[in-house]
Amino acid sequence: MEDNYKTIMEYYNGSSETSVKNYLENISYNNFHLYNLFPQINDSTFIPIELSITEDDANNSNYDSIIISDVLKKYPNVSGTIDYDNDGIVDNLTIILRNKADNAGSNSSLVSHKSDYPGGNDITLSNKSLGTYNMLNTYSIRNTKSSVIIHEFMHSLGYPDLYNSNNDYPVFTWDIMGNVISPPPYPLAYLRSYFTNWLSIDEITKSGTITLNTQDNKDGNQAYIIKSPLNDYEFFVVEYRKKPTLFDKIDRSISNSGVIVYRINTTITGLSNKFGSYGVYVYRDNSFALNSTPSSAVYNTVFSKELGRTTVGNSDLNSKDKALLYSDGTNSGIVLSEIGSSSSNSITLNVSIPNKGDLDVWNELKYDDINKNSGYKVQTSIEMNNKIYVGSITNNKLYTTVYDNGNWSTISNGTNIVIGDVSPSTMEFKIINN
C-alpha cells in the first residue's frame, strides 16, 4: 500500500501542474484552494477498510449508502477542517474503491461518479452531515491519473457532463467535463465564469477586431461572448487555447493551438449535454455536425494561420454551409475571419455580426402574411402605442392584424369591401378609439 500512497498523494497534492490541488488553483487563477485530508494514513501507508459488500456487488448495483456507512463507522471523526463554509455539512467526501477491471455495470458503485448522500442526518463525520461525495475506483485512476478525480470533483462544484451517449462528441477533449483524458484540459472559459465566477467575459454585439489571450493569463481576455440579434437564448463563445510542449501540463491533450468557438444554449438545464440536448457544443468543420468522429471533434475544431484555417461562419442567412448555427438549424450570420497566428500568447481575429437594422423585421417578429401567395395585394402598416398594426387588401377583402407583447392577433379576417384603383400610396390606415 506504500506505492499506492505515493501515487495517490502525487495525484492529489503533487508538485505537477495537473495534480488536483494545483489544477484547481491554476484554472481558478488562485481563487480556489483545495485542502485534502487522508484519515487512513499510518507511516506513509494507507490502511484499507474492509467493506461489508464484495467487488461483484459494487460492480452490479449501487451500494453507495452501505459503503459510506462502513467507512464512517471505521472513521467517525477526522482531524482537520472539513466544513470551510460552516454550513454544518462536510464540504466533500471522496471514497476510492479497489477494483481489478473496468467491467462495472451502469449506475453501479464502481462507476466513478458524484452524488449527494440521501440519508440526511442519520450518519455524520465529526458531527457534520454528509452532502456531496465522489465515488472513485483504482482502475480509472490508474488509467487517467488525476483527471478522473478532477472530473468528479468539478461535478461537486456544479459543473455538468459535456459528453453524451450518442457518440457525437459535442465537446470532447476541449474540456475535462467532455472527456476524462490525461493530462487534463482546461474547462471551457464560459463554464468557469458561469458556474464558479473565476473570470469575467466581455460580450460583443457589434462587428470589430478582438484579441484573445491564453487561458493561463488571469489578467487577459480568455474569451469573448458573441451575440447575434437573431436569438435571445443562444450565443457563441470564442477562446484561445495554447498547447504546451511539456507533457504533464494542462491542455497537453488538445490537438493544436488556436481559436475554438462553441455555442451556449441557455434553455438547457445546467448546460448539460448528457440527456440528449446540448447546452454546450464546439464548432467543427461542416458546421455543428452531429455524429462526428473523435478525430473530427479533435482536429476540425481549432483555427489558426498555421493550420490554414482562418475563417469560421457564413454571412448568408439562407445558407447553412460552414455556418455558425443555432440549435434549431438557423444561421446566426456571425463570421470570424482573418484568424491570426498561434505562435504567441495572444491571437487576433475579426468578428462580423449581422446588423439588426439589416434584418427582415417581419421575419424576426414572426409575421405570417395570410395573403403572401396572392398575385395582387395592397399592404401597409402603422406603429402606435407600442403596437404594430398591419392592413392588407386582396380580392376586395380587408385583413387587419396587430402585434402586441410579442404576439400577433387578428382584428378583421377578410371583411368585404368595394375599392377602385388602390395603390400603396393611396391606402390610408387610421386607428380610431384605440
Where are each of the predicted segments found?
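Active-site-proximal segments of metallohydrolase catalytic domains
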Residues: 15-126
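Extracellular low-complexity, Gly/Ser/Thr-rich intrinsically disordered linkers
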Residues: 216-357
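Entry beta-strands of beta-propeller and related beta-repeat scaffolds
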Residues: 234-236, 385-391, 433-434
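Trp- and S/T/G-rich repeat-edge/linker motifs of beta-rich repeat architectures
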Residues: 357-375, 397-425, 431
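Hydrophobic strand positions within the blades of repeat-based beta-sheet folds
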Residues: 381, 390-391, 400, 429
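Extracellular hydrolytic enzyme modules, especially secreted metalloproteases
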Residues: 21-26, 92-94, 98-253, 265-267
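Fold-level signature of zinc-dependent metallopeptidase catalytic domains
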Residues: 1-9
